[in-house]
């Protein structure tokens, strides 16, 4: 480790100890020498004994900075790793940090634009940031070419070395988790850290975010449900993104929405519809739909429209995942736990040798109490959470796309019920899911599949006669090759049999000559001729083995 890494590691451990986070490690895992070393080296008692453990963990991560804040946010979605009291506190982590100097942001923009002055491309550039987060901050301006209002998102300068340094330390700490926690191996800490690192590095590439926003905008073009601001891709680079500036009401500002006359019931239901449309129709969903990234248009409040920003994190499901997920939801709400268990096995989410009866019983034990509540109060997100937590006991592999979907669904549910507490998610989603499943099977699906593959078959049908001829010719050639190999094998067997026969004769002659030479020396040269004959026959047999 470098001196800088040692200093940073010391600060991290010191921060954890000052918040009493060594309580997370069972005492039996801390040997006496380790406890003495911990006291002697740091001499750092818990200074926040009056706070709950989850609160102390949240405050410690906030003190450690942006990389750790985002790590905590990601861990809050993995409720299989922590009890609810800790996961709920981690969910409160806010990705808000002090802005960096606007002059540095201006330099970043000029560097991204080929070292040309900002004034050459933008008017009214505001050096004071509109918003600031751990990875980037946003400035406002107008495009010089058309006068449109835009926001310019700029990556923080020198953020990459900070991220790499902290990630190295997080990896080091993750390697210790299996040694310190009884359940450490099941938690797969290295896998969790790798997943986080990929997400974090993806957020550093604003070209990727721009492409995601363009895709999402295309998917909801002319839709009354969701508006995605236009991205000006000619001005984008890995460290800078320029997009249309929008004006809307923050989705969690319920008072402002009501004052604007917004139809709150329709708005809440549309949030659910937007989510399921992204997942099942488009196979491409916004993976960071927390309230800070969602606004509501001021226009037509009786036909409200969402505005979505910050597409740095997106998810997608393949066709099989979508079908199994939809059928899982429907089977669960029909209380068909056997079907839920079978779907987990069929999808490959759990090993194929899983005992379906035991799995069904475990799902029923965990999920049946949920139905004690009215259907309108049941949380889709917690349904998924309970299913996944149960499945992990049966060695379900971590499915990153499903973890991200579950996190997003929890956001959507939270926002929806904040807007309209009586929101019945199942009533809103069930027709959509049933319609989607019906569309995937039967005659309509067959017709659609034929249409999708028609160009392929139109190209291949003229080639069929030639393919048939080539197949027949290759079949004939293959049969000839097989016959030839069989004939050669038969010849080889015959030769081997003859060789063994000749070896036997040669050995007999040589043995006989030896006995005659010993017992009848008066026979003269006869034993010698027998020996020579035996050697000759043996050599002929040896030659036939080649």
Curated annotation (Swiss-Prot):
Parts of the chain that traverse the membrane: 501-518, 523-542
Protein name, per record: Probable protein kinase UbiB
Enzyme nomenclature, EC number: 2.7.-.-
A GO MF label: ATP binding
Keyword Zinc-finger tagged: no
Active-site residues, as the UniProt record annotates them: 288 (proton acceptor)
One Gene Ontology term from the biological process aspect of the record: regulation of ubiquinone biosynthetic process
Domain of life (superkingdom): Bacteria
Function: Is probably a protein kinase regulator of UbiI activity which is involved in aerobic coenzyme Q (ubiquinone) biosynthesis.
Topology term for the membrane: Multi-pass membrane protein
Gene that this sequence comes from: ubiB
Protein kinase domain location: 124-502
Annotated binding of ATP, by residue: 130-138, 153
Assigned GO CC terms: plasma membrane
Compartments in which it is found: Cell inner membrane
Pfam families in alphabetical order: ABC1 (PF03109)
Family from the record: Belongs to the ABC1 family. UbiB subfamily.
Primary residence: membrane
Keywords recorded for this protein, A-Z: ATP-binding, Cell inner membrane, Cell membrane, Kinase, Membrane, Nucleotide-binding, Transferase, Transmembrane, Transmembrane helix, Ubiquinone biosynthesis
Pathways per UniProt: Cofactor biosynthesis; ubiquinone biosynthesis [regulation]
Enzyme class: transferase
